[in-house]
Amino acid sequence: MANNRDESRYKKWETDHEKRGTSDLIPAATVVIMRDSESGIELLMLRKNSKVAFGGMWVFPGGKIDETDKVINSDGSLDELATATNAATRETLEEAAISVSQENLFWFSHWVPPAITPKRFSTYFFATKLLDGDEVTIDDSEIIEHNWFRPHEAISLRDAGEIE
C-alpha cells in the first residue's frame, strides 16, 4: 500500500522524467545476506553515508558492475550473470568485509525499474547465508552502520519513515 511519501516521490520522478526523458541503465549487483537467529531469519542491511549516492538509505551490499568484473565468453559476448556474480562478491567484500564464495551465491532475480525512474539500475539480485565465523565489518566511510533486520521489521520501519 502506498503512503503519502511514496506518492510525492512518484510525482517528483514523473516531473523529472518529463524534463529529462529516459535514463540509461547502469548494470549492478546486490546480495541479500541472511542468517538464522532465535527470532527467525534476519537480513543484513547497511546504512550509506549521507554524503554518497543513496545517502542515509539502508541497503543490501551491492553496487555498480565495474570493468574488472566483466566475464567474456569464447564468442566475445558478455556473460552477464557471471559478470554480476563477480560484482556481487566484490561489493560484499568491500562494503561488509564478508568474503562470499561464488558457489554459495544464488541468483534469484533481475530488476529493471521503469523508464520514469531518474537513475536506473539493471540489478541482479543474489542471496546467500552468512557462514559461521563470518563477521560484518564496515569502513565508516561509504557505509556508516549495519544491522540485522527481520524482513517484516525492515518493511514496517520503512513504512513508518524510521528507515529509508
What are these regions (language model features)?
Residues M1-E164:
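N-terminal leader/linker segments that precede catalytic domains of diphosphate-processing enzymes
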